[in-house]
Amino acid sequence: MAETQTTKKGAKRVRQPVPARRSKPNRPAKAAPGPHASLSFLRVAPRKVRLVADEVRGMPVGDALAVLKYTPQAAAKHLSKLIRSAVANAEQKGGRVDVDVLVVKTLTVDQGPKMRRFMPRAMGRAFRIEKKTSHVYVELGTAQ
C-alpha cells in the first residue's frame, strides 16, 4: 500500500513501501581449521618468502623443518619458527601430538603493507624505495 504525502509547494508525492530484508541463505558451517599459526608484517618481500614456501608446502612437518634448516634464504628461518609454533599449538590444543603424522596442509603468503622510503639522488631528485612486508599463514593437517 502506497502512501501519499503533500510537499511544501503543494505537489503530491507517492511513497512506495520499503521491501522487507531477505534473510541470508542457510550455508553449511565451515569446518574448524586444524592447528595453525600466522606471522604478520614479516620484513621479507612476499616473492622471496613464496620461493621458500613452495619448497615445503605439502611436506610432513619433520621433513619440512629439515629442509628449512639447510635452506640459505632468510625467509627459511622465519618459516621454520612458524611451523614449530603451529606444532606447539597442536600440542597445546590436542594434547600430545605425533609430529610424524602432521603435514603442512596450507601455507599462504600474502603481501603486507609497504614502507615507503626516499633515496636522495643527483641534482636534488629523490627515488622512492618500497620496503615490502609479508603476512604468512600455515595450517597443519594429518597425512591422508
Swiss-Prot record:
GO terms for biological process: translation. Residues 1-38 are annotated as: Disordered. Pfam families: Ribosomal_L22 (PF00237). One of its GO terms (molecular function) is structural constituent of ribosome. The keyword Transmembrane does not apply. Keywords: Ribonucleoprotein, Ribosomal protein, RNA-binding, rRNA-binding. Residues 9-27 have a biased composition (Basic residues). Gene3D superfamilies: Ribosomal protein L22/L17. GO terms for cellular component: cytosolic large ribosomal subunit. This protein binds specifically to 23S rRNA; its binding is stimulated by other ribosomal proteins, e.g. L4, L17, and L20. It is important during the early stages of 50S assembly. It makes multiple contacts with different domains of the 23S rRNA in the assembled 50S subunit and ribosome. The globular domain of the protein is located near the polypeptide exit tunnel on the outside of the subunit, while an extended beta-hairpin is found that lines the wall of the exit tunnel in the center of the 70S ribosome. Part of the 50S ribosomal subunit. Belongs to the universal ribosomal protein uL22 family. This is Large ribosomal subunit protein uL22. It comes from Anaeromyxobacter sp. (strain Fw109-5).
